[in-house]
């Protein structure tokens, strides 16, 4: 029983909470700065480079997939408060799908695949999810035509 309480204390240690808080602030700031930059594709303003997803990958590596899931939810809530709740469906879909792809690849395939590959997968899945949300909200299936080009950009974004 004593071991369980020690593990719980370690999970909620001041250092751990502080590091996660700093990383949350960093990811949120990166997203906010990225949202101030004009869209890369004027015809697809919902497509983002996804710099904050690199911080999510770091949280997966340092703290594990469970903490990273809560981190993604907190990041989306903070950025929605700071930027706009209008973009929340796009951001939440992109972030959660990128998280799922990166966590699965990291847990199941790393070190057989590189961290760059994990990041690229997260970027591709994020932009596919964002496009899917745009198709649903705008009722415009023709937006899927942009996916090959968007996925190409996602590879570049994942490398960054």
Where on the chain are the PLM-derived regions?
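Short helix-perturbing small/polar motifs within transmembrane alpha-helices
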Residues: 2-4, 18-24, 29, 71, ...
């Amino acid at each position: 029983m004593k071991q369980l309480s020690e593990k719980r204390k370690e999970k909620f240690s001041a250092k751990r909470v502080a590091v996660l808080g700093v990383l949350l602030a960093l990811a949120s700031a990166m997203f906010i700065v990225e949202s101030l930059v004009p869209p890369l594709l004027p015809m697809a303003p919902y497509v983002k480079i996804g710099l904050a997803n690199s911080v999510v990958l770091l949280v997966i590596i340092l703290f594990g997939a469970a903490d990273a899931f809560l981190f993604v939810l907190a990041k989306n809530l903070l950025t929605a408060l700071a930027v706009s709740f209008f973009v929340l469906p796009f951001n939440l879909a992109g972030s959660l799908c990128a998280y799922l792809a990166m966590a699965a690849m990291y847990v199941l395939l790393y070190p057989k695949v590189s961290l760059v590959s994990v990041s690229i997968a997260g970027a591709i899945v994020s932009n596919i999810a964002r496009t899917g949300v745009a198709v649903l909200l705008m009722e415009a299936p023709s937006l899927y035509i942009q996916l090959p080009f968007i996925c190409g950009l996602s590879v570049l974004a994942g490398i960054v």
